[in-house]
Amino acid sequence: MGNWLVNHWLSVLFLVSWLGLNIFLFVYVFLNYEKSDKYYYTREILGTALALARASALCLNFNSMVILIPVCRNLLSFLRGTCSFCNHTLRKPLDHNLTFHKLVAYMICIFTAIHIIAHLFNFERYSRSQQAMDGSLASVLSSLFHPEKEDSWLNPIQSPNVTVMYAAFTSIAGLTGVVATVALVLMVTSAMEFIRRNYFELFWYTHHLFIIYIICLGIHGLGGIVRGQTEESMSESHPRNCSYSFHEWDKYERSCRSPHFVGQPPESWKWILAPIAFYIFERILRFYRSRQKVVITKVVMHPCKVLELQMRKRGFTMGIGQYIFVNCPSISFLEWHPFTLTSAPEEEFFSIHIRAAGDWTENLIRTFEQQHSPMPRIEVDGPFGTVSEDVFQYEVAVLVGAGIGVTPFASFLKSIWYKFQRAHNKLKTQKIYFYWICRETGAFAWFNNLLNSLEQEMDELGKPDFLNYRLFLTGWDSNIAGHAALNFDRATDVLTGLKQKTSFGRPMWDNEFSRIATAHPKSVVGVFLCGPPTLAKSLRKCCRRYSSLDPRKVQFYFNKETF
């Protein structure tokens, strides 16, 4: 735990600050509405539910302002580039942007639930006080009406015949609240891991309901349902002095005047205006870049239905491990899908590898398999930075890819090859451990040439130990295993043709980390993963377990690719 805090102290500080701000805003507004004389009469009808509704509303505004920032990809790429020479701990929060985005969304859900429940109680109490015939203060307040000031009422339910449901669904606040809540529920449920992985199109389209959510939030307070006593009225008849003699209001010259009330002006738009403006600028920038012409220079179909596209685009510059968003208008005009760049910055083109994993990718692969002329138009937005850009910042790098998750490391390994070709000897990275876990033997095919070239290059430069790679096959059968066993004495692997033999099963991570820690007792080791959450959990545990509490000894820093 201590080592984890050392590695993530800035992320923890940021998270604690955000939680602290939520708690402060909630408590501050709650106490204000619970104690303020301005809402003395409002509390007579609504009780504590008033303060709960208003406190949760402010926290909703705050988090609705914050939630757009983590998905402004250009801003994050700019900050990552600005912090490229900073300590990796300072860049760590940028790598958790989507995690923070989800946490803010969960917080919005919590405060939405509090806000809805509180206002359901409020409408019920408004209705009861309007129907009450007992002459209580609440019933008197509900019947107040000033002809000279038609909007100086306290109870939004003006008639005892109006039901709670009718009042809730016909008011601006009630109607916009229902629409915003439905949009929020659809966005949150469609963002679940299972749906996002298997039905990305559903997630993509549904998530754009945030536009409706933001619009409803902006106009939610226009009705001014929550009302407080006016300053002028309080100066004439202070509630703490006059509430006990409410039966005598306006009867005598010296008696208290009946109070006047005013609704609160809408405030939500003030919170969301700046991030909305920033997000609109972000979208305009994305649109401008996506409209620039992309030339497809080469199309390669690899085994296991993996499509490689090599492209060029004017003014396109990339770094290792970055990703782009791709759109094919002939398939879907609105859908944009993220793909990691597999080319190196030193190459004259940029490339991506696409595996069939859903309707959109299957349609794209099918389109290119048909080899129509001319080729379908491709639009590209990016590139955007990720945690994989930091690979060269570590003395020792451990790269772990699962299936198509190897793509970020293809860019890195290609760049290494080019750097050694050009006698680039200023690399901070002195050792690379590369692990690739695949279900099918065909998946290794498109990566073999690169690994083979790296093997030869390292041998020629006298650095055969610079790259240590292990390939693991998890989808093998008895025929494959028997064939490999019969040819075990061959100089090259029977499945891949590489010097390193393919292993069957999954890596024993404790053994691997123990070996690396022993080989590099005083090094800073960066562990990079592009793979499933279960594998991330195992690697994260190993990083904590094998990192020394002594900062002068081996330290493992876990980094997971997310986009």
Curated annotation (Swiss-Prot):
Sequence ranges assigned to domain Ferric oxidoreductase in this UniProt record: 54-282
Name used for this protein in its record: NADPH oxidase 1
Broad EC category: oxidoreductase
Expressing tissues: Expressed in vascular smooth muscle cells.
Extracellular membrane side: 32-44, 124-167, 228-395
UniProt topological domain (Cytoplasmic) ranges: 1-8, 70-102, 189-206, 417-563
UniProt keyword list: Cell junction, Cell membrane, Cell projection, Electron transport, FAD, Flavoprotein, Glycoprotein, Heme, Iron, Membrane, Metal-binding, NADP, Oxidoreductase, Phosphoprotein, Transmembrane, Transmembrane helix, Transport
Chief subcellular location: membrane
PROSITE patterns named among the record's database cross-references: FAD_FR
Catalytic activity: NADPH + 2 O2 = 2 superoxide + NADP(+) + H(+)
Subunit structure: NOX1, NOXA1, NOXO1, RAC1 and CYBA forms a functional multimeric complex supporting ROS production. Interacts with NOXO1. Interacts (via FAD-binding FR-type domain) with ARHGEF7 (via PH domain). The phosphorylated form at Thr-429 interacts with NOXA1 with greater affinity.
